[in-house]
Curated annotation (Swiss-Prot):
Protein's UniProt name: 2,3-bisphosphoglycerate-dependent phosphoglycerate mutase
InterPro entries found in the cross-reference section: His_Pase_superF_clade-1, His_PPase_superfam, PG/BPGM_mutase_AS, Phosphogly_mut1
Pathway: Carbohydrate degradation; glycolysis; pyruvate from D-glyceraldehyde 3-phosphate: step 3/5
Cited CDD domains: HP_PGM_like
Keyword entries, A-Z: Gluconeogenesis, Glycolysis, Isomerase
Signal peptide: none
Classification lineage: Bacteria, Pseudomonadati, Elusimicrobiota, Endomicrobiia, Endomicrobiales
Amino acid sequence: MYKVVLIRHGESVWNKENKFTGWSDVDLSEKGNEEALKAGKQLKKDGFTFDLAYTSVLKRAIKTLWNVLNTMDLLWTPVVKDWRLNERHYGALQGLNKAETAAKYGEEQVKIWRRSYDIAPMALDENDERYPGKEARYSGLLKGEIPLAECLKDTVARVVPYWGKEVVPQIKAGKKIIIAAHGNSLRALVKYLDNISDSNIVNLNIPTAMPLVYELDENLKAVKNYYLGDPEAVKKAMETVASQGKVKK
């Protein structure tokens, strides 16, 4: 039996402001830092330890991981950063307020953009200042690898192969692994691990900075999963995520 821990980054500044973030490299809010520290304490309390960590190339996930490992006195842990664990790219929606966008386009349309499996939002133009190809961190990527917008299906197409090629061999080698990533890159992985249908994935919401433990059999198939901490707090946090795309009243 293997275990792997997944954790979404703590609340970011744009989560707090209810904005679409995607590949925009915004920082953690004060609350987000506190959430990550709390997650580290919970993991330590429950006896978890790690000897390998994975995260994206976006600071909100990197800092969440750092806070968790620091709290657990595990800062020596090797960390692999990879763009394939980035949040899904929200295209031209990045930087827009979700509630204001819902007021303009309708809550149902925003829910489709946020949670559907195969419908991407409006794409960025390559001349847009938000285009990732302008950033040094993506200089090693081919032009065709840099998204202008993504749906969850696109995110699955980069996250799941990365899991299979890079993470699975390390789990089989006995490494104790934590993956600190994003709402949609983790939804992509959870969809695969739990074999969630394209239609049902719309209802899955992952709360910020709450450790999600997967127990896997010898074939790396999910046997069970559970969040650490208070179940009511987890439920409330999921509801908060689900409500972000609604018109503000």
